[in-house]
Amino acid sequence: DLTAVIDSMGLCLFTSFALGAPEYTKLLNAACGTEYTPEDVLEIGERIYNIERMFNKAAGMKPEDDRLPKRLLSEPIPEGPSKGMTSKLEITLPEYYEVRGWVNAFPTDETLKRLGLDECIGK
């Protein structure tokens, strides 16, 4: 969710990992004259990410399009602490959807309503 905010702020994602939500909140408040909390900013990011997902759905994205490159699913990691492991996307993706409040790759109507995105419901 923070990544969506960083992208929306027009900042470089590659250099963003040195800062966290509190620092980006201060930057956003200074630039916009707002008084957001880090929690507010993360919710804004969650809203952005869900809107992006609904845009992708409207553009024709299907659940089967939500995948990693075949190499990451079949080639074991060659070295380091994760040596020998491959991605278990078939296990982790449904768990990720559940945590996000999504079903089959897209936000549920309940998630959209919770985020105040009523205009996206049923689309």
Identify the function of each model-found stretch:
Residues 1-123:
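Extended C-terminal regions of large enzymes
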